[in-house]
Amino acid sequence: MKLAVFTDSSAYLSAETLQREDLFVLDIPVNIDGEEYVEGINLSAEEFYQKMAQASELPKTSQPSIAKLDEILTSLKEQGYTHALGLFLSSGISGFYQSIQYMVDDYEGLTIAFPDTLITSAPLGIMVESVFNWRDQGDDFASIQDKLAIQISRTSAFIMVDDLDHLVKGGRLSNGAAILGNLLSIKPILYFNDQGVIEVYEKVRTEKKATKRLIEIIKETTASGQYRVIVIHGNAPEKAEELRQHLLDFGLGSDVSLATFGSVIGTHLGAGSIALGYIPVI
């Protein structure tokens, strides 16, 4: 089996994974005040947050290019590939997953699967890494898909948003709820539900209590089995490092890494947001 793995630029990937010759990353363009950027090419995460703060309206992200995906899939067979696996951002965030399902049977001699990851950012990047690890240890395509299905079903992220007004602009919270929330210092905790949609999990008074509750949730959800936990932030590295230390103090293992929300999720959540993602080690 020669396996090609696809993902998109919403995935937070390690430098080592990005060097994989069998990895193909589709760009997700982001439009800020009429200018188009691609994160990692002409826009860093830090620059994105700076530009978003100065923009007259929320940035808009597009879907990855189906034409580019088709072009690469068409070329794979002549390069000796037999299988292709695409791990793209959640169908609850983007319509891309639905848009490409027709392509699965369109390439003769190539076995293709596009499962719905129901997630994005760092957990998505770890899924990509996991697929390469399973392949390298000799797993066949069916076994990789089985392990991936288990991993997807037990992966999520819980998020604390700094700016409620940002959720209003993105249509995820009513203006009245945001005004009341700001008056009462309410910090909603959001999460990726089992359809991969970001929704409110619960509402907590004050950031301190919300942070404590985030840690409790992760402790509960990762109690059985081995998990990797990731602190993901929207241009708030000091807050993220502080939360990482809290996790270590609570005994949530030594494998707690840091990552940054890129433009796709950063547009929804705004600067200062912070999340705890978790994914099982399989």
Swiss-Prot record:
Domain (DegV) ranges: 3-280
Binding site for hexadecanoate: 61, 94
Keywords: Lipid-binding
SUPFAM superfamilies the record matches: DAK1/DegV-like
Keyword set includes Magnesium: no
This protein's record includes keyword Oxidoreductase: no
Top-level taxon: Bacteria
UniProt GO molecular function: lipid binding
Record-linked Gene3D superfamilies: 3.30.1180.10, 3.40.50.10170
PANTHER family (UniProt xref): DEGV DOMAIN-CONTAINING PROTEIN DR_1986-RELATED (PTHR33434), FATTY ACID-BINDING PROTEIN TM_1468 (PTHR33434:SF2)
Function of the molecule: May bind long-chain fatty acids, such as palmitate, and may play a role in lipid transport or fatty acid metabolism.
NCBIfam families registered for this protein in UniProt: DegV
Full protein name: DegV domain-containing protein spr1415
Top-level taxonomy: Bacteria, Bacillati, Bacillota, Bacilli, Lactobacillales
